[in-house]
């Protein structure tokens, strides 16, 4: 199977997971803040950090599998465009503090999650 098709399949899986989170998060946490978008970006950043470190530092994840997991599944799971849309919606409603919070929380937490993913992978490898 071609790498292109594998990435497409991975993207479909990631997108399906994102959709499930998007319909579940408002029921669990309400609609005052886009918790679903924050959650998929946070988890995706953590997993991407771990996947890339494990794939580059070891032979545990082959280059093809790394491509499927990172570009496919994590690419489909995470969503920068939804972050932008939700932030612009806050701005159009005059909720500037929520717009700012959305940007700062996402960027800060996702950077931390990515670093935690790499650190966790290093810990698993004992390095």
PLM ranges: what are they?
Residues 1-127:
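Membrane-interface helix-loop junctions in multi-pass transporters/channels
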């Amino acid at each position: 199977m071609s790498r292109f098709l594998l990435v497409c399949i991975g993207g479909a899986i990631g997108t399906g997971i994102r959709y499930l989170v998007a319909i579940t998060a408002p029921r669990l946490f309400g609609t005052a803040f886009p918790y679903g978008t924050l959650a998929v970006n946070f988890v995706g950043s953590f997993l991407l950090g771990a996947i890339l470190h494990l794939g580059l530092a070891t032979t545990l994840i082959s280059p093809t599998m790394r491509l499927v997991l990172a570009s496919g599944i994590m690419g489909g799971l995470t969503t920068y465009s939804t972050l932008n849309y939700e932030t612009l919606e806050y701005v159009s409603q005059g909720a500037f503090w929520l717009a700012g919070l959305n940007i700062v929380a996402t960027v800060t937490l996702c950077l931390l999650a990515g670093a935690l993913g790499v650190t966790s992978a290093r810990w698993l490898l004992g390095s």
